[in-house]
């Protein structure tokens, strides 16, 4: 039996690669002749680039850039020939910012623009960027600063490139703007369709989880709106521009990037269609499968790309009651790995073992003679 194992990461617990390896161990315990092909995936959220680089055998490199609070910091990126990938969260991810410092209006993303300039100087032509899991809410002003834009208040004083400055912004200088070469293509791997502004936009949707007080939502949202009406009104209409606290919008406006489906692009890059062409079973998974998963998340994206006739089974941390009845979206069965009632911290810690147990049990089911 040949099985493709294509899970997303389990947030705050296991990477997609670790999830896939645990599931493989489970199947090896219960199916004697099993052949497991590991295809860790991501849909644009945090961990997507790590999932892709395992399949593409990319070389890890580092560059010193401006960090989240103006200090110098080393940032990872992954390269193969003229292709490069990186995640914004490697610089300004929630997990990298201590709780006491989580003010999304003070966190800087200038280093992302600096990294883009470096990659282009190294003759990179294809750049893929994951923007999920960020702690910033700067509307993309940091990206612009890293690409040479300068910002001033009404008295002509230079402003730092952070979200707070949007509240005092009076003018923008493009005198030192870095122009992206026409033969360079920058693509944003997105798993959300949130616009830049409004009640479905970056601030209202993600501000709270990043530490922004709800009393600031309206004024920050309006400041981002005013900024883009000055520099790039068209960006306000882009679906997905709100991803990464507006970083996606900044990349589109200032780096001529395009927003693409995170999961579909991931599957294209790892040549998923070829890998799944002759398999007996596909396993998908993520930490929590719910109705929101139906809108572009990894398990559904993988299931839709699986050939008709190949069964798809989901192995997840938890299954939420709002899911439609099975089968749905080409998924024939779904299993939660939870084995007992216990604190969340323990479930996260034991996830690898629970994944093994669940996969092993599914393997035993597959071994049963047809009834």
Curated annotation (Swiss-Prot):
InterPro entries: Glyc_kinase_flavodox-like_fold, Glycerate_kinase, Glycerate_kinase_RE-like, Glycerate_kinase_sf
EC annotation from Swiss-Prot or TrEMBL: 2.7.1.31
Keyword Phosphoprotein: no
SS bond list: none
Pfam families assigned: Gly_kinase
The entry's keywords: ATP-binding, Kinase, Nucleotide-binding, Transferase
GO molecular function, one term: glycerate kinase activity
Keyword Nucleotide-binding: yes
GO process terms (BP): organic acid phosphorylation
Reaction it catalyzes: (R)-glycerate + ATP = (2R)-3-phosphoglycerate + ADP + H(+)
UniProt family annotation: Belongs to the glycerate kinase type-1 family.
Protein name (record): Glycerate kinase
Lineage, highest ranks first: Bacteria, Pseudomonadati, Pseudomonadota, Betaproteobacteria, Neisseriales
Gene: glxK
